[in-house]
C-alpha cells in the first residue's frame, strides 16, 4: 500500500483525462490498483479502481462505490492515521530494535551490511539498523530497471555502495535470449541478488539486514528472524536477519 502523492495524482489526471478533483495528497492510498482512504475511526473506504487496458494505451479510474461527495467521509490524514496507530507502531519499532541488538551481539564476528532498493521495506530496515549502528554500510544492487528518481536517491544516500552488473537487463535479453516470466524472474536472480553474490567475498561472514515481511507472500509467511538464502547465496557463510518481518 502506497501513499498517493501529488506527482501520482498529476500522472492519473494527465493519463485518464479525468479531473479527479476529490483526490488530494495527504489522505489517499493506492493498494493493488485500489484508491482508498480511512476515516478517523480507522474504517476503510474504497473509492476508485485504477485499470490499465491490455494494450497499455489507456488508463482509467472507475468509482467503486456511490459517494456523492468523498468530502462527506470524515477522512483521516496520513498523520492522523499514524497517531491512531502510534502505540502499535511504537511497539513494532521497539521489538525490531531489540532484535537488531540481540542478533548483532549473537553474530558479533560478522560484518553488518544492509541491502537496499530504496523501497519502503529496505529503507525502514536501514533506518532501524542505523538508529543503533549509524555506520552500517548499505549496498544497492543496480538492476538497470529502476526509475530515474530511484537512481537520484541512491546517488545521494550516505554510506551506500552501488553494485553494477556487467550488462543491463535489456542487453542481457538480447544477448542471451532470456525472457522473464512469473516462474523465471531472472531479473531478481541475476540483478537484484546475483550481482551482490558475485562481488562479495563468499568466505567472509556477512550479517545481512533484510527488509522482508511475513505478510508479503505465502512463501515468506513462514520465514523466521534468522534466514539464509541457500538457493541464491550458494556456499557462503552469510547470515540474513529480518528485523521487520512482523510489520
Question: Predicted regions: what is each one?
Answer:
Residues 1-247:
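Nucleotide-activated chemistry modules centered on ATP-dependent adenylation/adenylyltransferase
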